[in-house]
Amino acid sequence: MQNKIANQSNIRRSNPVATLKKNAMLIILVLVYIFFTIMTKGRMFKPTSFASLINQNAYVYILGCGMLMCMLTGGNIDLSCGAFVCLLGALGGMMMVIWKWGTALSLVAMLAIGVVYGCGLGALIAYVMVPPWIATLAGYLAFRGLGTSILGVSSTNSISFKDSPDFLSIFSGTLFKTPEGQMNMPCMIVGVVAAALVVLLVFKNRATRLRKGYEVDALEMDAAKSVLGAAVILLVMYKLAMAGGIPTVLVWVAVVVLLYAFITSKTTIGRHFYVVGGNIEAARLSGVNTKRIMFLAYLNMAFLTSIAAMTTISRYTAANADAGKNFEMDASSACVVGGVSASGGAGSVLGMVIGATLIGVINLGMFQINLDANYQRVVKGFVLLAAVVFDILSKKQQKL
């Protein structure tokens, strides 16, 4: 009886205003999607648009996980990741196409280069105490120049991967491929299993928190979250089933997102990132190795950039000098729009995913209504500014 009373006291009462603020970006995402669906006369809701959204924005989700870890340490970002994608793409093209190293060895080499760069960058920032924006700006300038120079050996300033079908199938292929417009049952089965897992995890997490005496949301709120999450998964998988199957890049994105969601929420090292970003001096005094956390943030970012480079050049079917352009802006925008604090110490992988999806929907929607590229940049700039202002105002209200 006492346990039951204790559990009831740990249940938060539903506050409509607080709930609205907490889910503001999710609500905006839905409204923006509806807006562009109307403006494009339904094209945004077609199965091919769902597939395009995933394929074209895979790099944002992957880099966003890395940028999240950097921003958690105190609002730091990596300005070099886009240029590093260009350099890695050029080197990957040389290894796979020019030097004939084969797909497996070339991919391992690209990952190794990413790790080496990450160690060097992390050491400069964490131990030599070079400011992150200076260290990564140097990389931004150097890598773009190196990548363009390497690609200059080709008469077309690009290296095609059309003769590397194994590589293309790994990152830009389709699982359970069927003709477009035909129901893909394996795809739907995956969707049903994933939706069921979401519902199971929501209530398992609720039971665990109650057992440990932590606060939880009202039962109807958790039920609503699980139903909404399951519905979104089923809708996306249905659209992909009608579009021809599951893009292989979605598997890579799912693995990265789920892994980093686990790291940031369930591990000690993940919690240390939040502690360092919240108050670095307090973190140091409490025994957290702050230099190690900063080192790991940039090592991790470089490693994920290697994976993003693979998905990018595979989608382009070529390595070219434009690969990675403005990727650092897209990744940091996804984090900020998704609620990651610009000053560090707060944010989540789920929020980043919502932010990345919102940026992707805006990009795809503006493309489908043929909005001029310059105006597209203006819109994205205002979206980013609005997200930062929202973050600042929310923090001020919390202090009152």
Enumerate the predicted regions with their spans.
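Transmembrane alpha-helical segments in multi-pass inner-membrane proteins
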Residues: Y298-T311, R315-V378
